[in-house]
């Protein structure tokens, strides 16, 4: 019964295996968002015996908002294609502000007890006569005085330092390009409770979400709990943020080009994160175009530099 719910089947279809092929990113996301919206509309008309009528009605009430989201994302990308950068940012920031109530968030310290890993190509071992503190800083984000070394990556534009960390050393190595010679460090984000860094969480995948929803609803119904609305809203939020999460997760077709169009939308999202006081970064799954990272439970986090100290490092991250 559970696996036959039409909404379940549609969501499992959208498993973040996102590759634009010969289409440009604007065309690809326009087709992908439109198909997602149409599939959700069809799904609410089908058999959803497990989720039930209450959830279906909740989702129906949000279909207009979902349609807007699916239309606005390609509009933003098209503005960027036309070189209208100011309009791109304005429309993007408006969308992200509008989406704030739907975003999942997670504190940084909740991952592996706050332990993360960073790898950089080269030898950063501390040798005799070297300043250990200065050497360790070289494994942190690039200082503001060395902005000329900052390239463009998924969540960062050239010249704007961003700290990328992984919850697993192996994933950090893959993300670094699998260098033969490298140094790594383990970092502890030792904040707790409500003091942790707040991350917008794009790491959820449909099989994980639906598995959790199934367990929660079965337990709630067996115990005659009245809080099933909480679980319905959790699933609703997943559906509503999927188009944005997808736009930030398209696999790169060619990393050797000077301009990577798959990075346009996630870079825009991170610029919004940089300017808001409510969030500190993004938690996300790897989008490397390789089966070596498929199925890994590890995640990445990206933390933009917001406020510099005198030594060129971020005031809160350092």
Label each region the model flagged.
Residues 1-113, 118-148, 152-154, 179, ...:
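Active-site and NAD+-binding cores of ADP-ribose-processing enzymes
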Residues 150-151, 157, 169-170:
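DNA-binding interface regions
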Residues 160-165:
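A short, exposed loop/beta-hairpin motif centered on an aromatic-Gly-Thr core
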Residues 169-179:
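Short active-site loop/helix that positions an aromatic residue
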């Amino acid at each position: 019964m559970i696996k036959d719910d039409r909404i379940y089947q549609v969501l499992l279809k959208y498993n973040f295996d996102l590759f634009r092929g010969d289409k440009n990113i604007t065309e690809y996301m326009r087709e992908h968002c439109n198909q997602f919206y149409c599939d959700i509309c069809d799904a609410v008309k089908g058999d959803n015996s497990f989720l039930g009528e209450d959830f279906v009605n909740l989702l129906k009430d949000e279909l207009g908002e979902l349609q807007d989201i699916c239309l606005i994302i390609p509009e933003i990308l098209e503005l960027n294609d036309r070189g209208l950068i100011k309009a791109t940012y304005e429309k993007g920031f408006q969308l992200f502000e509008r989406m704030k109530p739907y975003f999942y968030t997670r504190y940084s310290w909740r991952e592996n007890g706050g332990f993360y890993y960073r790898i950089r190509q080269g030898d950063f071992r501390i040798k005799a006569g070297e300043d250990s503190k200065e050497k360790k800083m070289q494994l942190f984000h690039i200082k503001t005085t060395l902005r000329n070394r900052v390239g463009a990556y998924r969540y960062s534009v050239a010249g704007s330092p961003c700290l990328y960390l992984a919850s697993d050393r192996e994933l950090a190595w893959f993300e670094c390009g699998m260098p033969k010679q490298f140094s790594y460090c383990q970092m502890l984000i030792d904040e707790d409770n409500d003091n942790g860094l707040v991350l917008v969480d794009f790491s959820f995948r449909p099989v994980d979400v639906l598995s959790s929803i199934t367990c929660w609803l079965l337990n709630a119904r067996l115990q005659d709990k009245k809080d099933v609305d909480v679980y319905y809203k959790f699933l609703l939020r997943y559906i509503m943020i999927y188009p944005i999460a997808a736009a930030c997760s398209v696999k790169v077709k060619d990393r050797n080009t000077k301009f990577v169009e798959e990075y346009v939308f996630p870079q825009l999202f991170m610029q919004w994160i940089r300017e808001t006081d409510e969030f500190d970064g993004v938690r996300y799954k790897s989008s490397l175009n390789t089966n070596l990272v498929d199925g890994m439970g590890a995640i990445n986090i990206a933390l933009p530099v917001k406020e510099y100290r005198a030594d060129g490092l971020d005031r809160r991250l350092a």
